[in-house]
Amino acid sequence: STLQQKKLTHFDCWASTFGETTTAIELAPEGTGYRARTRFAKFFNLPELMSMFKEVADIKTADQLHLPVPEAKFETVVAKPSDLQKEMVQELSKRAAEIHSGTVDASVDNMLCVTNDGRKIGLDVRLMNPMLPDDPNSKLNVCVQNVLKIWEEGKDQKLTQLLFCDLSTPKNDGNFNVYDDIRKKLVAAGVPENEIEFIHNADTEAKKAALFSKVRSGDVRVLLGSTAKMGAGTNVQSRLVAVHHLDVGWKPSDMTQRNGRIIRQGNMNKEVKVFNYVTEGTFDAYLWQTLENKQRFISQIMTSKSPVRSCEDVDEQALSYAEIKALCAGNPLIKEKMDLDVQVAKLK
């Protein structure tokens, strides 16, 4: 085989020929500081790598296909953290320090627990304790206001919207969840309850087909769901005018699938909106950063353009993740540095 001919049958040989580890300063998972992290994040000899890959793969990307899809306007909505959120993030920082020093047993607390709690705090503190107050300026409430505005503007054409949230899905167990909270607020503001649906209620293929039909006709105008249940295979684009991302997954493909629900053939709208909601100074920044690292890695390979000899730059999609990371960190100098990095990359 080609790998045997080129003596690349072992991963170490392949890695030394095509890759390099790089060390970069990145946000710590607890969101309160920075750390140096070494990762495999740079490719060399890309033309040779891609010619080998194309022996077994045929790559077609969106920029090659020129499909008649709506133009998407991306908007990052940054919510200021409440004092309570700031306190809770600081508490996570202490937990992370204890875990890192080994003073806490992994069965009691670990970084996975800290990360999950960090995601919850960034979304809504009531996920940590339902008795805590509802912050009127939270990203959840800002999202509700945006949904209401677009719902009102699209009444005549019965335009529809999707809300993605992988955390706090409805379980019907009486506990607080953001799905029920959003619906309650929309109904209180005048949206008919029958126009709001959860994908989780369609638990059979027949129910799902009926629900999708209602969204396409505009009878259901606000549909909430998770990436797993409302990602691939959800064909409801006919009247879709906006998608709202209340949280972010770990894989770039998750965001591609989410946005693919609206940036799709068969949409009557020429322009659509994609909202990314982040809470400044919380784990949101770390999550977008993780996504950026993964997207950069993928983008260097899955491109329709002729690859350069080596690559570590970010593409447009990855750059939007970088911008969000800077906005979230609450430090404008990070954003300025990233903008300068991009300019330097272009000049090179």
Locate each region found by the language model.
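Conserved strand-helix element at the start of the C-terminal RecA-like helicase core
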Residues: 103-114, 156-180
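Inter-lobe coupling linker of SF2 helicases/translocases
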Residues: 2-133, 149-152, 274-342, 346
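Conserved helicase motor "Helicase C" RecA-like lobe of SF1/SF2 P-loop NTPases
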Residues: 167-200
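Conserved SF2 helicase motif VI
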Residues: 251-269
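Conserved helicase ATPase core of P-loop NTP-dependent helicases/translocases
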Residues: 192-227
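A short beta-strand element within the Helicase C-terminal
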Residues: 235-248, 273-276
